[in-house]
Amino acid sequence: MTVTGIIAEFNPFHYGHQYLLSQARGLKIVAMSGNFVQRGEPALVDKWVRAQMALENGADLVVELPFLVSVQSADYFAQGAVDILMRLGIDTLAFGTEQLFDYQKLSRLYSEQAEHMTAYLAALPDHLSYPQKTQSMWEAFAGLSATGDRPNHLLALSYVKASAGKKLQLQPIKRLGAGFHSEAKDQCLSSATAIRKHIADRAFVEKSSPNAALILRAPQVTWEHYFPLLKYHILTSPDLTEFFQVNDELASRISAAIRSIATVDELVEAVATKHYTKARVRRVLTYILVKAVEAPLPEGIHVLGFSKKGQAHLKTIKASVPLISRIGAKPWDQLTQRADTVYQLGHMDMPEQTWGRVPIRPGAMN
């Protein structure tokens, strides 16, 4: 049987995600971001709610990406997620993309030319952002023209690199409906960005997600719920460079801006440059918020939920893969658990995110 992996955030789950799951083949394993997502933001609703949405729409197994995989640049995010999915026994990786290319061919190219492509990337001028450098590399080696604002395609190219040299079939699925960053409310398939933007519009959410009731019932948070704590950490930390990926320049820019701004968006605008993208700045601010430092990734894989098929699959691999189904006295990943504790502070009705939680099973009360 085909075992398909899907890397996702489902922030929140919408009809485009439902379509992606419907097109994936065989048993479907989702490696999903936890309570903080790749672009350096808190998820709108918590990881347990999002796992339930996935399971109700065709996923067979949902596992959590550790914090230092979830909140990373595209290449590290992709590599960490693919590594976890490979340990879970996938043979296919399905992903949405705005542009359909022969990604399998690109993966073979990278496996053969990785050293030269990496050297080319390193030689590009520093005034270019990493996404710009990556686009230039693929244009030079594979003839791919600049893709503009195509975040799913750019992430797909990171999956190409992460899958190079592995026995993994790539299944690109054409993205339908609104663009990734579109905030439009008049699209047939609205984006997660639009749902987050218009979350107060109940009718819009109800027409945009098959799980609208779950989304609307759950505690919802944004960056602004955490700004006072972020500001406190910035103002009271003696050395911001002790936190993950905070260099001297970023520390200086953040410290200089923090006293004169009133929101996270204003802080990001003040700190970002051509070299430091807004996404990178948001990730750095997330690291400061949760006091993240460099740490090894956990050996165990945290299971958020499963169907009957998913449970049967877990039984076939549990002897060779350390699976965590309940976090108790022994921690799974201390950094991810600290991030969960911070996340809980964002809303007075936010349920416990770690201790005593057990995997979700469709149709069963958690």
Swiss-Prot record:
Its EC number is 6.3.4.-. Belongs to the TmcAL family. Catalyzes the formation of N(4)-acetylcytidine (ac(4)C) at the wobble position of elongator tRNA(Met), using acetate and ATP as substrates. First activates an acetate ion to form acetyladenylate (Ac-AMP) and then transfers the acetyl group to tRNA to form ac(4)C34. The keyword Ribosomal protein does not apply. InterPro entries: Rossmann-like_a/b/a_fold, tRNA(Met)_cyd_acetate_ligase. It is found in: Cytoplasm. It catalyses: cytidine(34) in elongator tRNA(Met) + acetate + ATP = N(4)-acetylcytidine(34) in elongator tRNA(Met) + AMP + diphosphate. The keyword tRNA processing applies. GO terms for cellular component: cytoplasm. GO terms for biological process: tRNA modification. Pfam families: HIGH_NTase1. Transmembrane segments: none annotated. ATP binds at residues 7-20, 96, 152, 175. One of its GO terms (molecular function) is tRNA binding. This is tRNA(Met) cytidine acetate ligase. Keywords: ATP-binding, Cytoplasm, Ligase, Nucleotide-binding, RNA-binding, tRNA processing, tRNA-binding.
